[in-house]
A protein has these predicted regions:
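Acidic/histidine-enriched, beta-strand-rich ligand/metal-binding domains
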Residues: 179-207, 211-220, 224-228, 234-245
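Pocket-edge structural micro-motifs
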Residues: 30, 51-54, 60-65, 284-285, ...
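Short, Φ-rich (hydrophobic/aromatic) sequence segments
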Residues: 22-23, 191-196, 336
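Assembly/oligomerization interface modules of large self-assembling protein complexes
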Residues: 39-107
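Long, contiguous amphipathic alpha-helices that act as assembly "spine/axial" helices in icosahedral shell
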Residues: 87-166, 188-192, 196-213, 324-330
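Hydrophobic alpha-helical segments and helix pairs
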Residues: 9-29, 156-186
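Sequence/fold signature of self-assembling virion shell proteins
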Residues: 224-350
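N-terminal alpha-helical "arm" segments
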Residues: 1-49, 341-350
Length: 350
């Protein structure tokens, strides 16, 4: 990576170099995208056509407008083609901005104007990539939790994208079923989990908790006795959930089911928030078919360079004037979908 960065700093920026840097240096791969959304389908059109995705000939979305924060389903409709919201985070290349120090970076290099400019561009791209990846992960999490989410974007009125999750797959503990009201020394929540899992359209092999949900689950003596924290007996699952960063913790196997705790966060209006609400439990399968689809890049420069169907289009350009200014931007039109939203069961613990 050090040689790559050195060569990158010594050369001028081309789209190919920006794409390579974005892929190698700024890859952002949160839990839900990595585990459940492994297929990618960039389209050459602004619209995503579900019938063109292998195995989704009959899939449709129910799209409803959102007015003053309220979903108006009476004005919505079912469709097999949809134009995703367009996102394009943009930054100015400002020589005065504060830079994050890279590991092993010589601080003397930052005094070199050319080096500093290139480092600023790289830092801008990292922030832009994280902004887009945050949108993708939020869509993915909401698709798994609710089977639907709100789509927003540049010059795009908010709409609700509904994949048709069965109501029985969104469960809220109530009426005496709350785990918080159970005797932690005698109650065994295994039967509850097995009952919830029956609502899934396939086999459940993973449960994802938020930290508070995990604390509630682990408070039962029966859980602590049954949880197998040894490694090696389920290598495929362990491989799928390892090396996911500090926001993910693999807790062990509960029977044939992997237990994972996710504390990933996003930033909204400068405030950090958790992707998973408090006391959330998600039952799913690591082979569920999540789809990363993308509308085409709507940029004349991209078309001229032959870049149309792509998840990302990074660019770096200058504007003439007094003074001239320089900018960076990454463009994308993401739409995260589940081929079968009923492969997941979402439980709000209480």
């Amino acid at each position: 990576m050090r040689l790559f960065l050195r060569d990158f700093f010594m050369s001028m920026y081309t789209t190919a170099q920006l794409l390579a840097a974005n892929e190698q240096k700024f890859k952002f791969d949160p839990l839900f995208l990595r585990l459940f959304f492994r297929e990618s389908y960039p389209f050459t059109t602004e619209k995503v056509y579900l019938s063109q995705i292998p195995g989704l000939v009959n899939m449709a979305l129910y799209v409803s407008p959102i007015v003053s924060g309220e979903v108006i389903r009476s004005r919505g409709g079912s469709t097999s083609e949809f134009t995703p919201g367009y996102v394009k985070p943009k930054h100015e290349v400002n020589p005065q901005m504060t830079l994050r120090r890279l590991p092993d970076e010589d601080p003397q290099n930052l005094a070199d104007p050319a080096y500093r400019r290139r480092r600023i561009i790289m830092q801008n791209m990292r922030d832009e990539e994280l902004a887009i990846a945050q949108v993708e992960e939020m869509q993915a999490v909401s698709a798994v939790l609710k089977g639907k989410y709100t789509m927003t974007g540049e010059a795009f009125d908010p709409v609700e994208v509904d994949m048709g999750r069965s109501a029985a797959n969104n469960i809220t503990q109530s009426g005496g079923t709350e785990w918080s009201k159970r005797d932690k020394s005698t109650y065994d929540p295994t039967d509850d989990i097995e009952a919830y899992a029956l609502n899934a359209s396939g086999v459940v092999n993973i449960i994802v908790f938020d930290p508070k949900g995990w604390a509630l689950f682990r408070s039962f003596k029966a859980v602590r006795e049954k949880l197998d924290t040894r490694r090696g007996s389920h290598s495929e699952l362990e491989t799928a959930v390892k090396d996911l960063g500090k926001a993910v913790s693999y807790k062990g196997m509960y029977g044939d089911v992997a237990i994972v705790v996710y504390s990933g966060q996003y930033v909204e209006n400068g405030v950090k928030k958790n992707f998973l609400p408090d006391n959330t439990m998600v039952l799913g399968n690591t082979h569920a078919r999540g789809l990363r689809t993308y509308g085409c890049i709507q940029d004349a420069d991209a078309l001229r360079e032959g870049i149309n169907a792509s998840p990302r289009y990074p660019k770096n350009w200058k504007t003439s004037g007094d003074p001239a200014r320089e900018f960076t931007m990454i463009q994308s039109a993401p739409l995260m979908l589940l081929a079968d939203p009923d492969e997941f069961v979402s439980v709000q613990l209480a």
